[in-house]
Every structure is written in structure tokens, then in C-alpha cells.
From Swiss-Prot:
Gene name as annotated: murC
Keywords on record: ATP-binding, Cell cycle, Cell division, Cell shape, Cell wall biogenesis/degradation, Cytoplasm, Ligase, Nucleotide-binding, Peptidoglycan synthesis
Pathway: Cell wall biogenesis; peptidoglycan biosynthesis
GO molecular function, one term: UDP-N-acetylmuramate-L-alanine ligase activity
Family named by the database record: Belongs to the MurCDEF family.
Primary subcellular site in the record, as a coarse category: cytoplasm
Record's protein name: UDP-N-acetylmuramate--L-alanine ligase
Compartment(s) of residence: Cytoplasm
Function: Cell wall formation.
A GO biological process held by the record: peptidoglycan biosynthetic process
Length: 471
């Protein structure tokens, strides 16, 4: 006899990965509760859907729960975790709960160091346009849906697969995407890159014999693991041996135009002329993954083309806030926000900004995320930050880590001055960033706010400041 689970509690329910699973469970008819240190858009949405959300962690919050879901950000000494264990309430890792959802449907899991959220969103959008009505769980807000999760009536669930804590090895999907493999979250893998690559090989081994691994062969590390993948593979990218291949890619007014050549199972599919409503070569690659999945699932070509042309993007992934007035009223600047926090992601986003807004001054307001990442990627950060025209650099967002000597915002500032590529302005308190941006901008500038921490609130503050000034 199965233990009947009706009430599920989430510790850290406002997190991107947690809130999506919570919403799907609510839609499945479960009673959902949760707690978080503060309120955000995700907690407010869940509360409006019927979840009981507590602010702050307390042992009493787990009362009545049949299961308690935790992410790796939740420590073992959390009072709710301690209370659950004391009361013998099962404590379930987030990835295990996601795996349970995947058991209900056919899973499409999107993995890779960079591009997971955008690729997952593109796959979900294309499948939805093709009439497959997928369930999806995304690490960002899909603008067209107004949410980061939805319960569909179709056979498929599309979700991100997180390698940061190796939790993607809990999943058993029928289709997988690997966008790229890069050195990040190396603490999980003992700072051994070979172990990280082996984890991705093991991820492909989770597929059934009839499953498909969709791999970006433009990435050298993905290409390196190809000989060790024993399941059927679909290669995508710009490379000549890609089965789903982009050619003639070019930037046009903030969009990407390209042609897709498809060769699957020894059969040439008709080429597709694509207009992707996103900037950047990296997003062409993300779209190719979605095209590969859709082609395998026999989504009509017209639906693929329409979904990509009308794609409305994902929150904090090159999210355009439009034009904001300069403080003196002499003109406006274009405001864009992005979640990028690894040098490779940042370089791709900044290249996309240059392509979308050629011949304009590029101003970057960046908040590094985690002291360990700043330490491990220090020289790469200096290199990519030196490519902009003006730089506002915040202190590192700790994300629970202790400071590391010579791996903070001041150290980056000093190194950038020595490199003499750009003169950084160090903004120690993130609360001062909106004013620092207003002090630095000129009419016609493109301002990109970037980072995975609290800098995500800055664009909204700039827009609110302007609206307040106009009233």
C-alpha cells in the first residue's frame, strides 16, 4: 500500500526551480505549502493559485505535510528540515520530485552549462504551437505564458536538467538536449573537469534504448563525449556534420535570420527559413535544439517557423525594458537585463547586444555571483568585462558563501584598471546602482544590467524612477 501524499511543503518555494514544480503540483490537485525568506513574484503567484506561503523558516510550517521538498540551497540545519526529519516526514530533493513528475509523462530534459532556460522555453513554445500542449518547468518566466511552469494535457513534460549539483542524474527522460559543457560549479565535481564531462555521459545513459540525445556539436566538450554516448544521437549546430544545421545566420533589427538544413535517419527534410525573435548566435544554437526536438516529434514545419518568429522571450534573458529617459531629459537610453553570470554567457550576451545595437555605446552594470566563481574565472571575467565601453561593477553577490581574499569586486576593479581596457566604476552597495547608472549614461547608450543576484531588481527600479519623475 503506497503512503498517500496529499500535502507537499517546499522549503525555499520562491526559487526558480522550486516554484515551477510547486505550480505543476498545485494544478495536479495537491495541497501545496511553502516558505521562503521573502516575497517575490513567484511566491505571490503561488499564493494566488492557492498555495499557503509563509515568510521565514519555522518548524511549525511543516505541520500537516506528507512530504517536504528541498533544493540544494537549503541547509541540513534548516528548522523545517530538522522538524520534518524529527517527525519522519520524507525530505525529498527537488530533482527527485521533478523526476517523479517526469514519470507521469514523457520527459524532455534540457541540460548544459549555459542556455538551459532559453532552450527549454523554445522547446516548450514550439511543441505548444505544434498542438502537443506540453507540461513545462522552466528556470525563468516564459513571457508568453506569464509563468515558469504549466500543466499541459499532452504527453510530454519539458524541463531543465541541473548539472550544478549533479541532480540531473536523478532524471529518466526520453529525450535530452546538451547545449554545452563548461567549467562551472566545479566544487560539485572536485574541481575535476573530466568528472564533469563524465556526469554528462552518465546523463545520456539515463535514456531508454528508444531515447534520443540531441547534442550541440559546435561545443568542443560536447563533441569530446560523443564517442561515449551509446544512445541514438542527433547533432545540431553550425558544424558541417550537424544533422540540424544553421547556415547564412545574420542579425537583423535585434532578430536572427538563418536557414536550417535537416538530415535525419538518412532522409533530408525540407530546409526551413527561420526568423528568430531573439538576438545572438548562441540563441540560433538554442533554437536549433528546439527544431531538432520538434522535427523528431513531427511538429509541422509551419508551427516551428511561427513559434520561433513569435517567441516572446524569457524573463531576465536579454529582457528588453525599452527606452528610459536620461536624467537631464536630453534623450533616452535602451535598457536590457540579463541573468548571465559566467564569462562565457556574458560574452555571448554582450556580442548579441553589439549585434542588435551596432554603433552604440555599450554600458554594462554587472554584479558577480559567488566568490568561488569569481575566484575560479577571475581572468576570464577581466577579459570579458574589458570589452564594454563603460562598466559599473557591483560587489559580489555571495549566495551564502563566505568572502574569499582577492576574489571580490574591488579585486576585479583593480585588475581591470591594470588591464587598461575600461575604467570601471565600483558600486559597493547594490542599492546605489540605479543612481550610478543614471550618472553614467548618455543619450543613445545601450545599458545592460547583468548577474544572477539582486541586480535583477535594478531595471524595475530605473523604470519606476522614470515613471515617478513623469507624474
Amino acid at each position: 500500500m503506497k503512503h498517500i501524499v496529499k500535502n507537499i511543503h517546499f522549503v525555499g518555494i520562491g526559487g526558480a526551480g522550486m516554484s515551477g514544480i510547486a505550480e505543476v503540483l498545485l494544478n495536479l490537485g495537491y495541497k501545496v505549502s511553502g516558505s521562503d525568506v521573502g516575497s517575490n513574484a513567484a511566491t505571490r503567484r503561488l499564493a494566488s493559485l492557492g498555495a499557503r506561503v509563509a515568510h521565514g523558516h519555522d518548524a511549525e510550517n511543516v505541520t500537516g505535510a506528507n512530504a517536504v521538498v528541498v533544493s540544494t540551497a537549503v541547509t541540513n540545519d534548516n528548522p523545517e528540515v530538522l522538524a520534518a526529519r524529527a517527525r519522519r516526514i520524507p525530505v525529498v530533493p527537488r530533482a527527485v520530485m521533478l523526476a517523479e513528475l517526469m514519470r507521469l509523462k514523457q520527459g524532455v530534459a534540457i541540460a548544459g552549462t549555459h542556455g538551459k532556460t532559453t532552450t527549454t522555453s523554445l522547446v516548450a513554445s514550439v511543441l505548444a504551437e505544434g498542438g502537443l500542449d506540453p507540461t513545462f518547468v522552466i528556470g525563468g518566466r516564459l513571457n508568453s505564458a506569464g509563468a515558469n511552469a504549466r500543466l499541459g494535457t499532452g504527453d510530454f513534460i519539458v524541463a531543465e536538467a541541473d548539472e550544478s549539483d549533479a541532480s540531473f542524474l536523478n532524471l529518466f527522460p526520453v529525450m535530452e538536449v546538451i547545449t554545452n559543457i563548461d567549467a562551472d560549479h566545479m566544487d560539485t565535481y572536485g574541481h575535476d573537469f573530466a568528472r564533469l564531462k563524465q556526469a554528462f555521459v552518465e546523463f545520456t545513459q539515463r535514456l531508454p534504448f528508444y531515447g534520443i540525445a540531441v547534442l550541440c556539436v559546435d561545443d568542443p566538450n560536447v563533441r569530446e563525449i560523443l564517442p561515449f554516448v551509446s544512445k541514438p544521437v542527433v547533432r545540431y549546430g553550425f558544424a558541417e556534420d550537424a544533422q540540424i544545421r544553421a547556415v547564412n545566420a545574420r542579425a537583423v533589427d535585434g532578430q536572427m535570420h538563418f536557414t536550417v538544413l535537416r538530415q535525419l535517419n538518412g532522409h533530408a527534410e525540407p530546409p526551413l527559413d527561420i526568423v528568430l525573435n531573439l538576438p545572438g548566435i548562441h540563441n540560433v544554437q538554442n533554437a536549433l535544439a528546439a527544431i531538432a526536438i520538434a522535427t523528431e516529434l513531427e511538429v509541422p514545419d509551419a508551427s516551428i517557423v511561427k513559434a520561433l518568429r513569435e517567441f516572446h522571450g524569457v524573463g531576465r534573458r536579454f529582457q528588453r525594458y525599452g527606452e528610459v529617459a536620461t536624467p537631464d531629459g536630453s534623450g533616452t537610453f535602451t535598457l536590457v537585463d540579463d541573468y548571465g553570470h559566467h564569462p562565457v554567457e556574458m560574452a555571448a550576451t554582450l556580442a548579441a547586444a553589439r549585434g542588435a545595437f551596432p554603433d552604440r555605446r555599450l554600458v554594462l552594470a554587472f554584479q558577480p555571483h559567488r566568490f568561488t566563481r569569481t575566484r575560479d574565472c577571475f581572468e576570464d571575467f577581466v577579459k570579458v568585462l574589458g570589452t564594454v565601453d563603460a562598466l559599473l561593477l557591483a560587489e559580489v553577490y555571495a549566495a551564502g558563501e563566505s568572502p574569499i581574499v582577492a576574489a571580490d569586486g574591488r579585486a576585479l576593479t583593480r585588475a581591470l584598471r591594470v588591464a587598461n581596457k575600461v575604467e570601471p566604476v565600483f558600486v559597493e552597495q547594490i542599492e546605489d546602482m540605479p543612481q550610478a547608472i543614471l550618472n553614467a549614461v548618455r543619450p543613445g547608450d545601450v545599458v545592460v544590467t547583468m548577474g544572477a543576484g539582486s541586480i535583477g531588481a535594478v531595471p524595475g527600479q530605473l523604470v519606476s524612477h522614470q515613471q515617478g519623475g513623469q507624474q
